[in-house]
């Protein structure tokens, strides 16, 4: 830009400054013209500052005052680049030197006051700007030295904001069509945005009055479109008078879209109107047709005017029908308007019933006054005493707010009543929710009780476990084996297969080998002993030498459908020994006697139902049994564990064992535990030694409770 200016330009600018700062009256248009020249960067800002500084040092006070006014005008309209030159040390130190000059060469008092006024106003407007900080330094230094400034005026910082031509940017390609610059394709800068473009994209010229440029200057196509749209207020189609060698997609995308959208919308609208007119003209029977339209229609080539006569005959009827329909439409419109007016009137009449609360509610203005008063009071707490007396606005606010006390008190009372109502409603809602939860719990408990009664659970407060089979509550017999770990009844995995030996338990009756298959079976069914899952194998634990007589292939697990309470699991201490076929048979059917004949299967199932009437306290001798006898496996009906709580009947005298086999009393207490811990799902434990797993036996059938026969006494059981 420096190539634009020369000595001729500076001399012309100096002449303009001399004419503007002559001793005559102030020429405001000339001052604005000079500021536009500075803002348009026609003259360098440093040269303009030097010219003004030279003119301020004139001996004539009128010239000095006019120069100071011109400087203020240029500061407010010359742009940021000129303000930085005014805020430089060269210009500000010149002003301070004139203020501090001796009385012989000191300027007039009016000139001094004008300088102080301008310095104060410039410093106020330059607060917060780092590049103009030297003005504030000069202002504070003059205050410390005791110079009396005029009353301070609040001047916004936007006073120094003025539009100026932007700084020029550089690029290797056109910033519009992206064409590379070459020796023939030269760079051109847009005076509006400062970007660089090729000659094809920056061929427009337009004056820029908002930047102080009154003569037409080069701008690019995008800025030209923006400025012309802004000036005319309507979209202008883009002229194509200049040939553009490189037309690219980017260049086309920069074109304004508003003109294209408007043209397409107008074309669509015109086409729609034409189609509607064609449809209206084509339907001759839809309404009255004028004679001009009938004459303009071409006559059909066939049949002459054979179809025209009936149309002319039907025209009066059609006209009458159309008139009747129009009359009906008018009546409907009138009815609609009347009903609509009535509705609006009723709504407007009902509207005042909603607004009685406005009498005591605070208006936004009153609320704002209250907030303002509170803010002022908070600020006055940090002020010296007596400040409140010098502020009449605070007194006026206090008087106006004092009148609002009754309204504020009433509003506060209404708010408190609403708060109490809200608390009451919340309490009611919480009580209702609590009652509802209680009702749900009662329904759930009743549902669980019904389910327990269906499966034969005697305890109404016991909640059934999430298992497939119902639990059996029975009095556990005394004299059972201790737990291996705790000495108590086993609580984990109560359905594992009992092993051959026990730690701390009672020994075998005579430590004899098991009986041969020729001996008699026990006559009690296994379902009568739910509290002792495996009486035959658990009570007779002969040495390992006795187990060698039996077959090693019959180590089996219990039937999957038998469910036993968790207290009757017998952990093994010694490695499991082999069990004979008779043992496995008695494992399912039980053998409590030594010499009794086996009871038929049907008698077992019947006598099982008759056991509640014959329940007696258990004794330790009932767990000492003879070796089992070979017995075929029975159907799963004999193994049904879903009966109610059963207890072992008193054994006959044949079951009496020697006294050395009686267990100590703590073992009897271990078996007499609450029945609530017996509701655990059956989970068969795997055998430690190889044998038959759960898959070797039938799966658990979903058996219903068989009907119990009341007061059925099995005579052979009583005799024995």
Swiss-Prot record:
It holds the Pfam family Vps27_GAT-like. Keywords: Endosome, Membrane, Metal-binding, Repeat, Zinc, Zinc-finger. Residues 230-262, 280-316, 479-720 are annotated as: Disordered. A zinc finger (FYVE-type) spans 168-228. It is a peripheral membrane protein. One of its GO terms (molecular function) is phosphatidylinositol-3-phosphate binding. Residues 506-518, 699-711 have a biased composition (Polar residues). Residues 290-301, 519-555, 562-577, 594-614, 668-689 have a biased composition (Low complexity). PROSITE patterns: UIM, VHS, ZF_FYVE. InterPro entries: ENTH_VHS (IPR008942), HGS/VPS27 (IPR017073), UIM_dom (IPR003903), VHS_dom (IPR002014), Vps27_GAT-like (IPR049425), Znf_FYVE (IPR000306), Znf_FYVE-rel (IPR017455), Znf_FYVE_PHD (IPR011011). GO terms for cellular component: endosome membrane; ESCRT-0 complex. Residues 264-283, 313-332 form the UIM domain. Zn(2+) binds at residues 174, 177, 198, 201. It is found in: Endosome membrane. Residues 18-150 form the VHS domain. Residues 650-667 have a biased composition (Pro residues). GO terms for biological process: protein targeting to vacuole; protein transport to vacuole involved in ubiquitin-dependent protein catabolic process via the multivesicular body sorting pathway. The FYVE domain is involved in the binding to phosphatidylinositol 3-phosphate (PtdIns(3)P) which is required for the association to endosomal membranes. Both IUM domains are necessary for efficient binding to ubiquitin. Component of the ESCRT-0 complex composed of HSE1 and VPS27. Component of the ESCRT-0 complex which is the sorting receptor for ubiquitinated cargo proteins at the multivesicular body (MVB) and recruits ESCRT-I to the MVB outer membrane. Belongs to the VPS27 family. PANTHER family: VACUOLAR PROTEIN SORTING-ASSOCIATED PROTEIN 27. This is Vacuolar protein sorting-associated protein 27. The gene is VPS27.
